[in-house]
Amino acid sequence: MKHEKCYILYSDEAYSPTVEKCAKSIRQFSDIPIYVYMMNSDISIDVEGTKTIRWDCEVVPDESPRYSQHGTNFYINRYNKSIYSMLIQRPLIAKHALENYSESVAYVDGDSVATKNADRIFGYLDPDSDHPAFVEGIYEVLFMGDRGGIYGGDYTRSLEHPACELFGVDQSVRKKYRQTGYFVAGHKSIGFLEEWHDMCSHPLIIDNCWLYAPFNEETIANVLLWKKKIFDGLPYVYVNIGATSISEVYSIGFSGQKNHIREWVAIPAEEEELLFFHGEKNPGNMQSMIEEIIERQ
């Protein structure tokens, strides 16, 4: 018997301690089932009400470093083809969960720490929608190195331009940029998920993900949204924690609109829209964050 709704996360073995803390944080505030997909590993996540599923997938070999270390935290190398081949499992995992475990799913990035509002994410789901509802991006236009930007009516320098050219998509219709770290999806979105993965798997993109998909599966999701002229989604519901702190966020407060406080850090419009703190990968630091959030209840 399927659940009405569930959370889904995924990881490889090296990343599993981070994802386990993410699942633990959700469980502090939610009794909704959690499914963790573990890529090419039998390791199990030890959190109550959480089921671990082995997910076998092909990982394209790439000898370049997968991660870069920054203090006690680390970040993925978006140039790395192995990382790309793991990230594009996201739509397939969401599809699998919808087909086998639940009528609706909420995908959550594994380097997230939930707040008491986490379950509100399911309130944004339209069960009749034929596409996932992705979270609003922190910025409307992204840059990477010397690439990116839209100048006047010239879209040819945008990060998404090569993929738009590849798939024949007119990006001038674009409105809000969407991020793929948080989304909700129902059964009627399975066709979208399949097309998303098919586009991500294009041989030219696999061979040169840096050119065509600089933000990996997220770049391609936006191209597909523009192709279908889909503009709705989740509001901005998280805070990047790397350059701020939980105490600072609550000290600044909520202004009724998305509030950019520094580069790559914004606070959602309302406190009830703050569902997750994002970006901390050190399990010890994540545990401290969980305890601080519990104390603030």
Question: Where does each model-flagged region fall?
Answer:
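N-terminal anchoring/stem segment of glycosyltransferases
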Residues: 1-78, 99-102, 255, 281-286, ...
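GT-A fold catalytic core of metal-dependent nucleotide-sugar glycosyltransferases
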Residues: 86-145
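A conditional alpha-helix N-cap/helix-loop micro-motif detector
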Residues: 15-16, 84-87, 214
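Short, polar loop motifs at secondary-structure junctions
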Residues: 37-44, 116-118, 237-239
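Charged, glycine/proline-rich intrinsically disordered loops and linkers
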Residues: 56-81, 142-170
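A glycosyltransferase accessory/donor-loop signature
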Residues: 1-5, 9, 18, 163-180, ...
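Short amphipathic alpha-helical segments and helix-helix/interface helices
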Residues: 20-27, 94-95, 119-123, 221-222
